[in-house]
């Protein structure tokens, strides 16, 4: 350090390794453990415990804590390199092999082994716990050939006996193919019927929903029009002291429940306010004017 450098005073600690607190025997924890029967160098807990065989020298030392400075979950392994070896080590091994007198064929074989190990480690790190299982083969179950019923005259039995073996196999194959084709046709027809019935049901449901919506809209529009007409009539006639204002007749409610929304309550409140302002008696009560 030259003369132009800033002057810094550094004081060397009496305990540079920070071991005074761990070696002290005057602390509260050390004293209370001794009072409970613990001695320095012994393990915590009962001596005849079931897990006493798993104790090591680290069990008698101080607890060491690892600082967690990442966002990984508990038990997660830190990300390691896929190869975990210095760059160019393969080429260096090949150079050493040439210097030791190995042939090119041996070097190529060793390099191929190293490449295979690299690929295996890369695949194990990228796709963990993936096991590819070959799928089985789907084989159609063959229907058992039905034995033709015996006729009254015994003609069927004689025909079956006289038919050669090759012809019998051909007939059995034809019967199985015919039965399979009939089964397929029946299954296809059943599926078509089911799809048609489902489509018709869905169409009917949609039609009913549309009709219900139209009925609701028509009823709400009729009720709003009737309320507006009654308000206009009361406004034209004007309030009087002797004659009480006729209240509008409530429209006949249908059995279907109408949704009571915020706008309907707000409209009622505004209508009541207008009626109170138009009535002289209510205005006098509001302004506390005695007549």
Curated annotation (Swiss-Prot):
<dbReference type="InterPro" id="IPR050656">
    <property type="entry name" value="PINX1"/>
</dbReference>
<feature type="compositionally biased region" description="Polar residues">
    <location>
        <begin position="15"/>
        <end position="25"/>
    </location>
</feature>
<feature type="domain" description="G-patch">
    <location>
        <begin position="25"/>
        <end position="79"/>
    </location>
</feature>
<feature type="compositionally biased region" description="Polar residues">
    <location>
        <begin position="146"/>
        <end position="156"/>
    </location>
</feature>
<dbReference type="GO" id="GO:0006364">
    <property type="term" value="P:rRNA processing"/>
</dbReference>
<feature type="region of interest" description="Disordered">
    <location>
        <begin position="146"/>
        <end position="268"/>
    </location>
</feature>
<keyword id="KW-0690">Ribosome biogenesis</keyword>
<feature type="region of interest" description="Disordered">
    <location>
        <begin position="1"/>
        <end position="26"/>
    </location>
</feature>
<dbReference type="GO" id="GO:0005730">
    <property type="term" value="C:nucleolus"/>
</dbReference>
<feature type="compositionally biased region" description="Basic residues">
    <location>
        <begin position="206"/>
        <end position="219"/>
    </location>
</feature>
<feature type="compositionally biased region" description="Basic and acidic residues">
    <location>
        <begin position="230"/>
        <end position="247"/>
    </location>
</feature>
<comment type="function">
    <text>Involved in rRNA-processing at A0, A1 and A2 sites and negatively regulates telomerase.</text>
</comment>
<dbReference type="InterPro" id="IPR000467">
    <property type="entry name" value="G_patch_dom"/>
</dbReference>
<keyword id="KW-0539">Nucleus</keyword>
<dbReference type="GO" id="GO:0003676">
    <property type="term" value="F:nucleic acid binding"/>
</dbReference>
<keyword id="KW-0698">rRNA processing</keyword>
<comment type="similarity">
    <text>Belongs to the PINX1 family.</text>
</comment>
<dbReference type="Pfam" id="PF01585">
    <property type="entry name" value="G-patch"/>
</dbReference>
<feature type="compositionally biased region" description="Basic residues">
    <location>
        <begin position="1"/>
        <end position="11"/>
    </location>
</feature>
<feature type="compositionally biased region" description="Basic and acidic residues">
    <location>
        <begin position="194"/>
        <end position="205"/>
    </location>
</feature>
<protein>
    <recommendedName>
        <fullName>Protein pxr1</fullName>
    </recommendedName>
</protein>
